[in-house]
Amino acid sequence: MNDKYAQQRLLKEQLPHTWDALFARFGRFTEIQVQAIPPLLDGHNCVLVSATASGKTEAAFAPLLEALKENSKPFRQLAILYIVPTRALARDLVRRLQQPLEKLALRVQVKTGDEAALNAARPPALLITTPESFDSLLANHPRMLKDIRAVVIDELHIFDNTPRGDQLRILLNRLRRLKRYALSRGDITNDAMQYCALSATIHDPAAVAARYFNDPRVIQVSGQRALDAELLELESVVTLDSLFAELKTRDVKKVLAFCQSRAECEQWAFEMRDGTPFGDRVFVHHASLDAKVRRHAETQFAQSEVALCFATSTLELGIDIGDVDLIVLIGAPGNLSAFLQRIGRGNRRTARTAVVCCYRNETERALFQIFVAAAQAGAITASQPYFFRPSIVVQQLCSYVKQTTYGELDPDSAFELFADLHGTPLLAKAHYDQIIEHLTAKNYFTTTDSRLLKPGAAWSELFEQRAIYTNLVDLTRVTIDVIDEETGRKLGEVERAIKPGGTFLFGGHARQATRLTWRKLIVRSAAPAREARPPQLRSAWRPMAPALAQAVAETLGAPQPQHPADLVIVTEAEAEDESPVTWVFHCAGDAYGLILGEVLETLYHVRVEDYNDLYLAVKGLVPTGPLEFTAVQVQSGLRRRWKQMESWFELGRFQEQLPLDVRRASVSAAFDVAGFVQTFQQRRIAEAVTAE
């Protein structure tokens, strides 16, 4: 006890400026703060991994702010860049930090698409922003960033191995290049920066952080809150009615329910608005709603003592929505990380997390069983192998040319930005040259006499659409604004027009379309109608990862191999004049299953009639014995199927602006040919063993 007291006192003494502002109201440091603050004070780059609401934000800020306050002169430049994945999280952080930083006489501001423009002549000491707004700042106000001393990346696992994560890697390279240039001109005296990344759930944090900055020290504190999980079969609306009706006996007042799609959020909110303990305190939160509408829902939900909110992944992250008594999951998310993120939103001020997992089929039940077991064991599964997405090259070149002094760039110099921290290129030079040639042919760029690139007509169109700084939205997605007839306010966006007179669900309420003008749908509130349905809203679909598919197969009791190397088949005899049907239990996910089917068709002249994440249904006889194929045969299957699979992976909004060869190569990289070969090479096809 005395040792811990002495440790706390010593740490407090090391923070003479920031203790009172950031920690005094808590009275003590949390474990992650005890472990993280000393190395950060010493100037080390760190990645902090600990549970939600454990104090990671203060652990990162205190040492960085302390370094600023050590200088007695007022600091008038932007010093700390804090990068978050969502605008809502940025707003939440600035609300939390405004008062503490006022005590330190330091200004904090938010820079996102929702906020007013920054005054470049009077920047804050701390800027909270998203990758997209960071990109815009680099392109339009690069000099404002030359004095940055530290970069913090919040929710690192949300970014990594996604288009936005790849974008962030290149943005940091651009920032480092900018600072080297400023140093060479004598504008700054030191181009060094300190880095800190934060995450609650991440596998191999050192390797992940090393993609963004050098020499990361891992500061990891184990210990998730205890999990009380209940699995409930969701048969109908009555199931949730019964669940919510008994909440009073559980002393549950505030519930956050995660759905798998925006349409489900709308439908469930409409169904639950009457006859539940929540009355009219039923809210909806998803990406198709306008930012102001979402913000209103966040505020109302946080301030309500009794409330229910249906949300998609938009509320997965750690914005303050008050103390949630119960998390309800309607359908299983696609991976463990999303499951942990969602359940982490509940009971943040207690030692236990309560969650009800509602499954609609046996696969969802198996997924929940796997996720709950992993969460209770504190396990974090490995993510899919990392690959760099070439579509980011298109977006970053379009942004980088805006940053250059004369509005033109040297493609060879720009290529150096697309490299890891050791200078190894992230894509082949041949592919890069193809991209440059393709973008020039498509008039994104024109070429000067000295082989420099200048913006072309297609670039100008992107710029007018304010689309050159983001990888978030599909370029082909055309939306229609939903406008409230009475107030004139935008409620959100839909992707297909609703005919005047039609009734639909939006924002948890029934709306009637009154008229449709160009890209604007005018609506009024409508009386609840049982036939009202949500508008068609597209949702991304992702294939199940091979390791997760294997775990699902084992949980469901699918035929298992007698030996680890066996690939189990079940052959069903058909009528004499028909070929047999062979069920191939690959248990490796949809993507691997699809290409395995291509390989089997090539090897055995059979026909695949159906496939999913666990099995193939093959018309014809698949012989037992070694499964022998080549990587060339796998690539041949990918060449036939790449277009079908392109939308399965997160490849970035500029994927279709790549030359065909590079598009195919990026699908192949996402598919992970080496992983496929490792999974199936040397496997032996064997009939399932039947129980005696």
Where do the model's predicted regions map?
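N-terminal intrinsically disordered, low-complexity tails of helicases
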Residues: 1-35
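Helicase motor core with emphasis on the C-terminal RecA-like subdomain
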Residues: 2-9, 34-35, 41-47, 51-131, ...
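Short linear motifs in intrinsically disordered
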Residues: 88, 209, 344, 463-475, ...
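Flexible hinge/switch segments at interdomain interfaces of large molecular machines
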Residues: 221-223, 387-388, 469-477, 575-577
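Short, compositionally biased strand/turn segments
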Residues: 299-301, 305, 472-497
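C-terminal effector modules of nucleic-acid-centric enzymes and ribosome-associated factors
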Residues: 374-386, 390-438, 485-692
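Accessory beta->alpha helical hairpin/"wing" motif in late/C-terminal subdomains of nucleic-acid enzymes
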Residues: 446-467, 521-530, 615-617
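Short, amphipathic alpha-helical interaction segments positioned at domain boundaries
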Residues: 459-486, 533-539
